[in-house]
Amino acid sequence: KLMRGKKENGEFMKPFSPLKWGDAFTEGNSWHYTWSVFHDPQGLIDLMGGDKAFVSMLDSVFSVPPVFDDSYYGFVIHEIREMTVMNMGNYAHGNQPIQHMIYLYNYAKQPWKAQYWLRQVMNKMYTPTPDGYCGDEDNGQTSAWYVFTALGFYPVCPGSNEYVVGAPLFKK
């Protein structure tokens, strides 16, 4: 139940590989862009068959080995390299289109999974070392993700006034 690219005539692109980077997915793959329904997480949950199936798919992002198909680019782009080095399955935090994904556990009534993975990402991908900052900054998104997440909330849907609770680093 992953998103697929379509041709101009409305047909789905074939063959389909959820691990193929590029083509229909800019600097990412279907495992990353499937979650980009910022405006309607409940609709995506329903489309996937409910909370249990949705959470299973979210879990799969972290358990699918960090393998990839780079045939569209013809070489390993830095976003792919960053994903494989972080060794968190197909979760590619260094590329912004997936950064909101962990917060989607909240919509499926499993906030403890969001809290667990948020802390994993903060502890593993943001460290006070020369290589302790993952991926691109891209207009401040990567540092904004960290600041929001450290404060304990995040705007999953840009432009809305809704924030989703996470795992704050501060007790007060």
Label the model's feature ranges.
Residues 2-169:
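Active-site core of glycosidic bond-cleaving carbohydrate-active enzymes
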Residues 172:
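Catalytic-core signal marking the mid-to-C-terminal active-site face
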